[in-house]
Amino acid sequence: MAPAVARPRRGAEIRAAFLEFYESRGHQPIPSASLIPVDPTVLLTIAGMLPFKPVFLGQQERPAPRATSSQKCIRTNDIENVGRTARHHTFFEMLGNFSFGDYFKQQAIEWAWELSTEVFGLDPKNLVVSVFREDDEAEAIWRDVVGVNPKRIIRMDEADNFWASGPTGPCGPCSEIYYDFKPALGDEDIDLEDDSRFIEFYNLVFMQYSRDAEGTLTPLANKNIDTGLGLERMAQILQGVPNNYETDLIYPLIETAAGLAGVDYRQLDVKGQTSLKVIGDHSRAVTQLICDGVTASNLGRGYILRRLLRRVVRHGRLLGISKPFLVAMGEAAIALMQAAYPQLNERRELILAELQREEARFLETLERGEKLLADVLAAKPKQISGEQAFELYDTYGFPLELTEEIAEEHGLSVDLAGFEAAMEAQRQRAKAAAVSIDLTLQGAIEQMAADLEATAFRGYEALEHPSCVVALVVNGEPAQTASAGDAVQLVLDSTPFYGEGGGQVGDRGSLNGQDLIVSIESVNRQRDVSVHHGTIERGQLSVGDLVTAQVDPTCRRRAQAHHTATHLLQAALKQVVDSSISQAGSLVDFDRLRFDFHCPRAVTPAELEQLEALINGWITEAHSLEVQEMAIEAAKAAGAVAMFGEKYADVVRVVDVPGVSMELCGGTHVANTAEIGLFKIVSEAGVASGIRRIEAVAGPAVLAYLNERDVVVKQLSERFKVQPAEITARVAGLQEELKGATKALAAARSELAVAKAAALAAQAEAIGEHQLLVARLDGVDGGGLQSAAQGLADQLGDGAAVVLGGLPDPSDLGKVILVAAFGKAVVAKGQKAGQFIGGVAKLCGGGGGGRPNLAQAGGRDGAALDGALEQAKSSLQQELQG
């Protein structure tokens, strides 16, 4: 018997009915996991099964033999389709039932069918199921046990109906349940790719095999079930609305946004409705992301949040919302979802504060950028240049993807190659004229340092040292006292902090005293005075205070490893590449090193391998370093390497790796090469005429680098279902396949369009010596539509006036293509295809043009297409009769 839930319709009822159905069948309810996953290989929780992945892979104990959940998910890979199609979302909920070595295929299928037909009340005649092409067992269960019409059981290929955790490991076939919105079309030639007719709402994964390195499938002793039912999709079906956005899960947010904009969703054109859908969808996503601990930034999941927030603001402005409104949308989203996710209300203040802060920051950016972009668009360019896009980005902080989005709305593209070129030119200018600190502040620091004695450096002997504050700068002005929250620059009488110099970055750490903590972010040198840059985290600091200066030992160790590795790299280059190589510059950071050197040619891949092997050999040999001070002439006589053009004192510090390297150096180093651990070259490239650059990592940074690479390799391996060593060949093969498929598809579309068009010729209207044909032809791309129009014009003769319009994707009203082909006699009459079709396109919210005899244009309002074609026909009838 089904649970006592009478035909659920509302989203909350659907969720409750699903969970109750499976709980009554022995499944343990599992709360939704965070959108920030435990799995480090993914930024966000993208699927309902992700929290259970370690269980399926045998890495974690199962929570119960059977489980059920409603998991919140975020996907942004198709963000440009959000609002434009009926079913694309960023935030969505996946209802799932899972079996960990308990029940299997027949039980999962029977329950899925029972839930769909008896609990949700779907008519079996409106359902279609898919199975993997080789899964005879699943087909037999659907046909013989459940009783599905065999014509409504569709076999699909591996790409659609076979799940794998990677190139090796657990895997198995899938079976999906689709809802048919047009059952009257019958059971013949069912095409599940027809999104206007079918929607897949339930996916059943049968994990029954283990695949080895050779690709052999072995049946698993313990088989698993992983299913997913899209809550938004089931709501669309049960509520009888045309798309997921008009369900009660999202539509209240659309109404909120419409109210803020003073518009009526039902009365808007496609563009306006799309903006409201984007706002509704993204408002759910950003609210949930912030609730789970994501903050806006320019990296990782923080960048995803920032991009979503900015898209909401951008689409609000398109609707005429000029004032801040994200807080209002956040309030509405919390109210809509808090019953299912009570933590939203618990973290309300945090969520709203982040929304308000990020919107204020972006509105300032947006207003400046939109004004400049409007000027660019007013000139009606064919393309937004890379220089223009870069000016928007560099001067106004306008994101490139936003420029691309606005350009697309106007039927334009952005010169991305030009943008990258402008970006690189800016990097070079920044290097030449870099000023790392405000001039006013710099002046105050220089003045402070000029009046002080040299700072005694104690960092060679110890990482902790008692010191006295001898000078202080706050807000660019000399000061006697600073308080919590102040950003300060200060000088100590003596310090264990290494000040930036010789290519090595300054130390990090803290100053500590009674009820005092000062975080030190960097240290640099003015003459021989070490200036510490930091923030007072707690307490008050005054000139004359005694503090304990503590260097962060982890940062120091990592800098030391990279500095000694830099010395080894120079020695190895002299040995492997050319003994005359000399240093041109360097950077020694906590997580990487960069070494520039004079060399007339690139270092070959074989030489790079030799360099790595040689350096790692020296590391393994555990050479103890010897550091001593000696007269400059004695050091040079001993063979110590000095940097050309550098001025040295009479007495210098010499860092010696016996038998390997000897250099003049004031930086910090490991005591023994074994402390470096490992060395890895990341890149080699030219940076100027006769100067090459090697970037590398050492110590723990090598593991971090390799882990990043490993994640990428694993993702590619899983995506392509091949062994890591086969990825390159697989990519090359796919590129060739894509090239061939693209060419074949273009040819097929062109042929199809011409074939469809041939039948249209009979519909041409004779007007004197002219033949007029205006028709709609959907499902054909721009090239195909041009071929069709040209073919018809050729067929109808010199007096032909052919206008064709259509939607390349009939389910997407956001893209319209229009083509005009005029014969010689029509052109001679003063009609130009380019001008004419451009005017027609404006009726569809677009533009375009071309030659007098053949032209193409585009639009964004598919709902206006029929009316535009009618006006085109009427206009040409009048012109040709004249």
UniProtKB/Swiss-Prot annotation:
GO terms for cellular component: cytosol. Its main location: cytoplasm. Its EC number is 6.1.1.7. It is an enzyme of class 6 (ligase). It comes from the Bacteria. Signal peptide: none annotated. It catalyses: tRNA(Ala) + L-alanine + ATP = L-alanyl-tRNA(Ala) + AMP + diphosphate. InterPro entries: aa-tRNA-synth_II/BPL/LPL (IPR045864), Ala-tRNA-lgiase_IIc (IPR002318), Ala-tRNA-ligase_IIc_anticod-bd (IPR018162), Ala-tRNA-synth_IIc_core (IPR018165), Ala-tRNA-synth_IIc_N (IPR018164), Ala-tRNA_ligase (IPR050058), Ala_tRNA_ligase_euk/bac (IPR023033), DHHA1_dom (IPR003156). One of its GO terms (molecular function) is zinc ion binding. It is found in: Cytoplasm. GO terms for biological process: alanyl-tRNA aminoacylation. Keywords: Aminoacyl-tRNA synthetase, ATP-binding, Cytoplasm, Ligase, Metal-binding, Nucleotide-binding, Protein biosynthesis, RNA-binding, tRNA-binding, Zinc. HAMAP family: Ala_tRNA_synth_B. Belongs to the class-II aminoacyl-tRNA synthetase family. Consists of three domains; the N-terminal catalytic domain, the editing domain and the C-terminal C-Ala domain. The editing domain removes incorrectly charged amino acids, while the C-Ala domain, along with tRNA(Ala), serves as a bridge to cooperatively bring together the editing and aminoacylation centers thus stimulating deacylation of misacylated tRNAs. This is Alanine--tRNA ligase.
